[in-house]
Each structure stands twice: as structure tokens, then as C-alpha cells.
Amino acid sequence: MPPKRKSSPKGKTPTVVDGLSTEEMSKEQLEEHIMRLREELDREREERNYFQLERDKIHTFWEITRRHLEENKCELRNRERELEEVEERHQVEIKVYKQKVKHLLYEQQNMLSELKAESIISTKLLQDEHADLEKEQWKDMRSLKLELKQQELSSENVLKRIHLKHDEETTDLRNDFARQVQEIGSKYEKRMQKLRQEEELRRKTEIHEIEERKNTHINMLMKNHEKAFRDIRNYFSDIVYKNLDLITSLKEELKEMKKNEEKRNKEMAEVLEQNKELKESSQKAKEQVAELQKQLANYEKDKSILTRSRARLKMSDREMKELKWELEVLEQRFSKVQLERDELYMKFTKAILEVQQKSGFKNLLLECKLNTLNDTLEKKEAQLSEVLSASNLDPTTLSVVTHKLEEVLESKNHTIKDLQYEVARVCKAHNDLLKTSEAKLRAFGIPVEELCFEPLKSNGQSVGQGPAMFVSSSN
């Protein structure tokens, strides 16, 4: 039943409906009027209930959205915590790798020490062999001196025995001996010339073949090394530049998303204020509901965009960490290569100085030996000529002396030829080593003018052009 009407105060003007007051209406008109009022009341109640339901829905949706926001914040904190843990684990792994690198460097240092010790031992062995060879040469010189002394004694005895012969045979013997000496000299000169030409041709052929093989191999290795180094440097440079640009763009997008999120938070506050105002006016509430629905759609869209952006940011951070790790590894490798280059440069400089000293000393010794032998040979030839000119020899004794003289001359010529070849080979190896070292220094970008010494170039006999250090090592 409808609620009872309150009694109107006295003197109140009666209600007018359709131009008639309620007192003037009939019963049927009053009933119709009451029915209309009841229908209007029902409509107003239905509208009130509808707006209350809409208000409850909006409030519920706001609560759900707030809970989702809190859950997302919790998830974001968890993700940040996980990222911190991953970063800590990554730092631990980096320390482990650094320790491994230290161990590898220590092993490399030990290996270099062993190689250095082996090189010292091999150098000592070579020095011992050189000393033994020098001792053998001194023994040969002593035996040769003894033979010459014996020959002098025998010549003196022969001179005493044949001094009593006639003076007429002296002239014939001198002429015959001069003729034989000239024939022997021409014969052995032709033979020596032929042997020199054959040995020179064979040596030049071998040197040329070795030069071609080694130069081809060295050029191929240098080209492959330069190509590989250039490719890997270009590859990592492109990767670093591309990822830096991508990280910068993603950071800018993240800043923009944060601004949008702040804007959406402000809009949510405004929505709460608008919900309070819904109680005042139903029409205003309808308009605000439509506006809120639009804002909600925009919020969902921005929320999905923010989720995708965070995923992209996470992926970019992971890629950036990987690139940082690769960059650190490359920097370590680069520093290691620089250290190796400096060590090789120091060793190379030291080796050049040692080779210069050894080759200079060896050249000096060989030249001194050669000069000594030449002087000795000239003296002996002069003494022998004087003895022969002052004595009268029979043909048998003369043939014996001539045969021994030929043997002595042949051995001396062989010794002189070997010493000359050794001097020329050492000079050539020294000069080619200087050329090869200068080429290597230019290949590594080190100017030759910055060396702390002046390379000593030998002026010895040339035996061909090419990497003669390989010939010397093989010999």
C-alpha cells in the first residue's frame, strides 16, 4: 500500500490537477490521479534502482582495477628482484671467468718460460758445436804447419844432397819446372772456375726455390690474418652500434609509457570524484558513465601497450647485458693481444740485437781467419818459390813435391771457398733478416724510425736475394 499522505497545514492552497483542485475532483478523477502518481513513483524508483546498480558496477570495476594495479606493482617488484639476483649471478660468473683467464695467463707464462729455457739450451748447444768446429780447424792448422815444417826439413836435406850436381842441369830444371807450374796453374784454375760456376748455379737455384715457397706462404698467412681480423672487428662494431641505438629508443618509449601511466592515474582520481558527483544528478551520471567507458577502453589499450613495452624493455636489457659481456670479453681479448704484441715487439727487438751482435762477431772472425790463411798461403808460396829457385831437383823429387803442393793448394782452396761462402751466407742472412724485420714492423704499424738502435747492414758478398735465414737454418 502506498504511504499515507501527511495532513496539509491549515490555510494551504489545494493542489490543482488539469485545471481542477483535488477538492473539486470526483472520486474517479482522484483515483486516476492517484494511479498516475503511483506510476510516476514506480518509474522514479526503477530509475533510482538502475542508477544505484550502475554506481555499484562502477565501484566494483574500480576495486577490481585497483587490485590489478597492485598485483602488477607486486609483479614488477618481483621482476626487479629477479633481475637483481640475475645480475648478482652474472657478476659471480664474470669473477669466475676472470679467474679462469688469470689461470690461462699463468699457464701461458709458464709455457713461455719453458720455451725460453729450451731456446737458451739450443743456443748453448750451437755455441758448443761452433767451439768444437773451431777446435778442429785449429788442429788442422797445426797439422798443416807440421807438414810444412817437415817439407822444409826434407827440402833442406835435398838441397844439401843435390848441391854437388852440375850447374848445367839447373837451367833446364828451372825451365821445366816453370813450364809444369804454368800448366798445373792453368789446369787447376780452369777446374776451380768450373766448380765455382756449378756451385754458384746450384746455390742460386736452391735459394730461389726456397725464397718462392716461403714468400708465398708468408703472404698467404698475412692476408688471411688481416682478413679475419678486419671481419671480426666490423662484425662486433655493427652489433654494438645497433644495440646501443635500440636501447636508447626503448628507454625513450619507457619514459613515454611512464608519463602515460601517471596521466592515467590522474584520470582515475578524476573518475573517483566523478563517481561522487553521480549521486547528485542522474543525467550527469549517464554522461560521466559514457566518458568513463571511453577512458576505460583507452586505459585497457594503454595497459596492453605498457605490458608489451615492458616485455620489450626486459628483452632489450637482457640483450644489453649479453652485449656488455661480449664487449668485456672482447676488451679482455684486445688487451691480451696488445700485451702479446708488446712482448713480441720486445722479443723481436732483443732477437735482432742478438743476431746483429752474433753475425757481426762471426763475420769478423771469419774475415780474420780468411785474411790469416791468405797471408800464410802467400808466405808459404813465396818461401817455396825461393827454395825451388835456389835448388836443383831431379824429376822424381820434383813430381813428389809438386803432388804434395797440389794437395795442399787444393785443401787450402776448399777452405778458402768454404770460408768465403760462410761469410757471404751470414751477411746475406743478416741483411735479409733486417729486411724481414722491417717488413714485419710496418705490417704491425710500428715505424722503423722509432727503434732504439740503428740496424747494422753488412757489405759482404751477395749470394742472391730472398729469405736467406731459412737457408742458414736448414744448413
From Swiss-Prot:
Family, similarity comment: Belongs to the DRC4 family.
Coiled-coil ranges from the UniProt annotation: 20-104, 142-200, 242-426
GO cellular component: ciliary basal body; cytoplasm; extracellular region; Golgi apparatus; microtubule; motile cilium
Residue numbers spanned by region Microtubule-binding: 114-257
UniProt-recorded Gene Ontology molecular function terms: microtubule binding; small GTPase binding
Protein name: Dynein regulatory complex subunit 4
Compartments in which it is found: Cytoplasm; Cytoplasm, Cytoskeleton; Cell projection, Cilium, Flagellum; Cytoplasm, Cytoskeleton, Cilium axoneme
Role, per record: Component of the nexin-dynein regulatory complex (N-DRC), a key regulator of ciliary/flagellar motility which maintains the alignment and integrity of the distal axoneme and regulates microtubule sliding in motile axonemes. Plays an important role in the assembly of the N-DRC linker. Plays dual roles at both the primary (or non-motile) cilia to regulate hedgehog signaling and in motile cilia to coordinate cilia movement. Required for proper slow muscle development and positively regulates ciliary smoothened (SMO)-dependent Hedgehog (Hh) signaling pathway.
Family annotation (PANTHER family): DYNEIN REGULATORY COMPLEX SUBUNIT 4
Annotated transmembrane regions: none
Keywords: Cell projection, Cilium, Coiled coil, Cytoplasm, Cytoskeleton, Flagellum, Golgi apparatus, Microtubule
Annotated spans, Regulates microtubule-binding: 1-113
Gene: gas8
Annotated region described as Disordered, given as residue ranges: 1-22
Phenotype reported upon loss of the gene: Morpholino knockdown results in attenuated Hedgehog (Hh) transcriptional responses and impaired early muscle development. Morphants exhibit developmental abnormalities, abnormal ear development and defective cilia motility.
